[in-house]
């Protein structure tokens, strides 16, 4: 069988989507910096899609684009564009127009509740949400002002986030982010570590950073001296 030099296949990627409103560029830029300050390294050079559905036809697209890039993001495309003039300006700037499916994670305009996001709005750490089912690829869980407990597997491509601690009694292959609002005393516990990424209060480690003795084992992840540490549990 002849082996072709390339293959073209369809695939699905999980992306952050930035939803723009009709506000002055400097105000929006400052707000964006405030939103990402708890995760400065996690979002450095991160790919992001821009939704302009609620923007007026008179926005200065080049100024907006430059403001987003200056915050450390790589724009991969723009969605929600219904105005012909704006669409042409976006295309001329070198970016594609995206056909947007169902949004899975609206990070910068509060966290939405849809069929792929489960959000828990709590004023106090009174009750910890518990998930007994597997967290599937593409699904995102967010526990607001709370710890999070999962008694099953977190699949590759899934993302679990909590403002408090995270406990996972299962195999972890997706992303795990604790202390999402900046609490660096939060910790992550899991019984089988294969995670793509773990993060606490903006500091993160990728799977390639894990030591061999922690991979696939029961571990505790915590922050000390502004660095993440992973220790194997007995």
Curated annotation (Swiss-Prot):
- A GO BP annotation: division septum assembly
Under SUPFAM superfamilies, the record lists: Cell-division inhibitor MinC, C-terminal domain
Q: Could you list the residue ranges forming a coiled coil in this record?
A: none
Q: Which Pfam families match?
A: MinC_C (PF03775), MinC_N (PF05209)
Q: According to the lineage, what is the superkingdom? A: Bacteria
Keywords from the UniProt entry: Cell cycle, Cell division, Septation
Please report any disulfide bonds recorded for this protein chain, giving both cysteine positions.
none
Q: Which InterPro entries match?
A: CAP/MinC_C, MinC, MinC_C_sf, MinC_N, Septum_form_inhib_MinC_C
What is this protein for, i.e. what is its function? Cell division inhibitor that blocks the formation of polar Z ring septums. Rapidly oscillates between the poles of the cell to destabilize FtsZ filaments that have formed before they mature into polar Z rings. Prevents FtsZ polymerization.
Q: How does it assemble?
A: Interacts with MinD and FtsZ.
Query: Which family, according to the similarity comment?
Result: Belongs to the MinC family.
Q: What is the name of the protein in this document?
A: Probable septum site-determining protein MinC
What is the organism of origin for this protein? Buchnera aphidicola subsp. Baizongia pistaciae (strain Bp)
